[in-house]
């Protein structure tokens, strides 16, 4: 995968580790799943930090900060249009390009439109204090 392809809104496969799993002492994601690259923080030496949000078919509880993915966006991101899917925005994984044990050398699956994804990122930034992350950086 070209490192330049890892930009805000692109969808990749990643062994996402849920916060609840990390709190129980797990260190590895149980399966590779689609995740959205939310933010790419530019760092020296090409070791940029990615903030990754999970995509799931499990309906989130009402108290979660999540957004259902519309059919048009599922098509753009090349996700299964026959499933109801949500992007979870109150938790995330962080990983570092160039030092990751988890990023696969595959091109992104697809990409969300700016019209759909950027308002979600603005809301994430506004709610950042109430979110939880798992640092996958090594």
Where are these regions (language model features)?
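C-terminal terminal-subdomain/extension
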Residues: 4, 69-138
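A broad, low-specificity signal marking well-ordered, structured residues that form hydrophobic/aromatic
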Residues: 12, 50, 67, 86-87
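Compact nucleic-acid interaction/catalytic patches
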Residues: 24-32, 38-75
